[in-house]
């Protein structure tokens, strides 16, 4: 339960800071200028559906539910730079582990699943995009997976799965690599 709550809070904070402010519908509309679109990913072992969208008011701290999408364990997600797509992991410790692509309507807060691709590495716990590719860090798989993005925003099959090797001093916890994050540099 604590893990689910922490995931909701962390993803909500990151995605609300990564999405653009809703454009004012009328000049001088202060309330519309204070609203952000917030996307929340959850673990789905309980009653959760997976992905949720909210309209978040920065001024008074309220969130209004907009929509939901059923997807399993989207514990980490990232919006595309233009906000038209959401990419989310499905965190599993088996062959079900996947990256999902959704079309996203910011005005309505609605999701439409485009497709899902297997990561080839267990427990994807981080996802990032540079606009051309989506990359996952696969914690238990000790790997990263690279997915080219198709013209419609969907994900093509992994073009590469890079598996790391090695162990640490604590043989019980560090028997193999456990990736937490992958970042793309501008160079």
Q: In which residue ranges do the predicted regions lie?
A:
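An edge-strand/N-cap motif at the start of beta-rich repeat modules
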Residues: 25-56
């Amino acid at each position: 339960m604590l893990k689910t709550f922490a995931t909701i809070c962390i993803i909500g904070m990151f995605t609300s800071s990564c999405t653009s402010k809703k454009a004012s519908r009328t000049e001088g509309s202060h309330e519309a200028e204070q609203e952000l679109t917030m996307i929340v990913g959850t673990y789905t072992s309980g009653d959760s559906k997976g992905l949720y969208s909210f309209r978040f008011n920065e001024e008074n701290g309220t969130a209004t539910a907009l929509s939901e999408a059923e997807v399993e364990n989207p514990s980490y997600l990232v919006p595309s730079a233009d906000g038209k797509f959401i990419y989310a992991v499905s965190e599993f410790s088996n062959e079900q582990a996947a990256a999902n692509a959704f079309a996203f309507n910011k005005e309505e807060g609605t999701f439409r699943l485009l497709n899902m691709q297997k990561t080839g590495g267990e427990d994807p716990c981080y996802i990032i995009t540079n606009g051309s590719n989506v990359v996952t860090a696969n914690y238990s798989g000790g790997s990263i997976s690279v997915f080219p993005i198709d013209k419609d925003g969907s994900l093509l099959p992994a073009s590469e799965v890079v598996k790391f090797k090695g162990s640490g001093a604590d043989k019980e916890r560090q028997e193999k690599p456990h990736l937490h994050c992958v970042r793309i540099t501008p160079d």
